[in-house]
Every structure is written in structure tokens, then in C-alpha cells.
Amino acid sequence: MPAKLIMAWDIAPQHEQEYLEFIINEFMPGLQRIGFLMGDAWVTVYGKYSQILVYVLLPSKKDIKQALQGESWKELHGKLMEYVVNYSQKVVLASAGFQF
């Protein structure tokens, strides 16, 4: 059954431009190279929730867990951590509608 990797974070203060360049030029293409299918991304503009919420898909939870153990993910994730704070992630079975 398809599964989602749901990630949430806030952009680190004073790193907005570098963050944006990284997301566009490295993070999203890197996720695709690993094999993730792009889902949706949301930006929170009001309230006490994570500023960014993104999900990507793979065919199963097992596939996601294997991808998260790979060197490509570790490198990509490590670089993301240079630009974000309050990062969280979880793996869930995909269902229709909004999941967080």
C-alpha cells in the first residue's frame, strides 16, 4: 500500500534566500533521484503550526524506511537541516485527503 513521508519545518531566520535556492535546486530534485514521487507542499501563513509541510510518496512504508537509511537521503537531510528549524517527519500509509 502506498505510503507518505510527511515532513514539517520552519525556515531558519535569516536563511530564507539560501533555503529557497536549496529547495528548488537540490532538495526536490534529490528526493526525485531517490525515487520519491512528489506529493503536495503547504505554507502556513497564520497560526502556530509548522511554516512548511511537505509530503512525498513511495509504494510502501518499507520502501520509505529503506530510502531514509540511504546515504543520498542522509546527505540531503543533513543539508536541509542547515536551513530549517523545528523539523519533524513521520511515515504513514497514504490515504485520500490532507494528512499531517
Question: What are the functions of these language-model segments?
Answer:
Residues A41-T44:
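Short, solvent-exposed loop/turn elements at beta->coil junctions and helix N-caps
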Residues P2-A3, G35-G39, I52:
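Short, flexible segments with low predicted structural confidence
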